[in-house]
Swiss-Prot record:
EC number(s) from the headed UniProt entry: 1.1.1.432
An annotated Gene Ontology molecular function: oxidoreductase activity
Catalytic activity: D-glucose + NADP(+) = 6-dehydro-D-glucose + NADPH + H(+)
Name by which UniProt lists this protein: 6-dehydroglucose reductase
UniProt similarity note: Belongs to the aldo/keto reductase family.
Cited Pfam families: Aldo_ket_red
The entry's keywords: Carbohydrate metabolism, NADP, Oxidoreductase
Active site: 61 (proton donor)
Residue intervals passing through the bilayer: none
């Protein structure tokens, strides 16, 4: 029963040369509930103090259907303006390309503006990782690539990524890019296992992309499983969690991190203790039998 390797203290972000923690903190809900810059600063410190240096946001975060576009970036920008030294401790990722109500715009003019606007809201000179949030079917990948390459060559962006792209969309964009993609961000969790068998992670390994997993806890379904399948997955995670003295949440993060593609789960919580807890996943060791037990539970049938 062979053990799988523990994740390294830092992962390389694709071929970019940027080193990131093997787990990230996401700020989808940072601007909710009247959170102040002081409140947000406590969360940033919680992540950094736990060794989580990879922070992921997006220009759409904060939008409530009528207002709030850019609010999460702007709130983080206030934190960085008040404590400039924090910027040197983090790898900062953001996303753009969703523009309600269109819903997507990756025209050259809009992409340039989106990057500049994010820089302004974040109050930074450079974005470490800029990602296209969702694909615009009306945008030619050649034109998109030109804008992204320009953003890198001008020093506004260090590395490039995509989110919610299909394998073919990744291949098409990467073909035209001079500065090749460093990351892909699909939904991955013990309850969302498509990418393990549909070739997405195989492509990531082939191209040297770092997969970033959004919603790694299945949108809260792992915390309160309702279906027989979800309960079976939770039970399989609990077997390892209880043996190693961690929570089911931590076991779920570590299960993703054990995959050879180097998946980086994105913590979605906006609670300091839950953010810090995520760092415990680096210490959880999986063996093949236990890892496959989770996969089999998620599939709902035995492997062939």
């Amino acid at each position: 029963m062979s053990d799988l390797p523990l994740p390294p203290a830092f992962r390389q972000l694709g071929h970019s040369g940027i080193a990131v923690s093997p787990i990230a903190w996401g700020m989808w809900r940072l601007a909710e509930n009247g959170r102040t810059p002081a409140d947000a600063a406590k969360l940033v410190h919680a992540a950094l103090d736990a060794g989580i240096n990879f922070l992921d946001t997006a220009d759409i975060y904060g939008f409530d259907g009528s207002a709030g576009f850019g609010d999460a970036e702007a709130l983080l920008g206030e934190v960085l303006a008040a404590e400039p030294a924090l910027r040197e401790r983090m790898i900062l990722a953001t996303k753009g390309g969703i523009l309600p109500p269109l819903p997507y715009d990756q025209s050259a003019d809009y992409l340039r503006k989106a990057i500049d606007d994010s820089l302004a809201r974040l109050k930074v000179d450079v974005i470490d990782l800029w990602q296209i949030h969702r694909p615009d079917i009306l945008a030619h990948p050649y034109e998109v690539a030109r804008v992204l390459d320009d953003a890198v060559s001008s020093g506004k962006v260090r590395a490039l990524g995509v989110s919610n792209f299909t394998k073919d969309q990744i291949a098409a964009l990467n073909h035209f890019l001079g500065e090749k993609l460093a990351t892909t961000q699909p939904e991955i969790s013990p309850l969302r296992i498509d990418c393990f068998e549909n070739g997405e992670l195989d492509q990531a390994m082939m191209l040297g992309l770092t997969p970033m997993a959004w919603s790694p806890l299945g949108g809260g379904r792992l915390a309160s499983p309702q279906t027989a399948r979800d309960k079976a997955v939770a039970d399989a995670l609990d077997a390892v969690a209880q043996a190693q003295g961690v929570s089911r949440t931590v076991a779920a993060y570590s299960w993703l991190m054990a995959h050879p593609a180097g998946i980086v789960p994105i913590i979605g919580s906006q609670q300091a203790a839950r953010i810090a807890e995520g760092a415990e996943a680096l210490k959880v060791r999986w063996n093949r039998q236990d890892w496959y037990a989770v996969l089999v539970a998620a599939r709902g049938e035995r492997l062939p």
